[in-house]
Amino acid sequence: MQTYIATFFSHFGAIRFNKQLKELGLSGKLMPVPRRVSSSCGTCVKFEAESDTAVHSDDLEQLFLVNGEELTMLHSNI
């Protein structure tokens, strides 16, 4: 399993994404966006999945792979 952080254009998008994760049997955690990441919305979802293609959302702003303290951007809709 890989750990990811997803940012969103709106708080509602983050909540909806977290609900989608639960429906897929994945656990997500709503949390403040890390300071080193710029985002339209101040809320992100941290989650674990086998791959970044396991989930999709039209509200997704950016997707990062988490490796310890390092974040690698995988996708951006900015």
For the regions a language model picked out, list residue spans one by one.
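C-terminal structural segments of small proteins and small subunits
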Residues: 48-78
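Amphipathic, hydrophobic secondary-structure cores in small proteins
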Residues: 2-11, 17, 22-50
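A structure-centric signal for secondary-structure junctions around beta-strands
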Residues: 1-2, 60
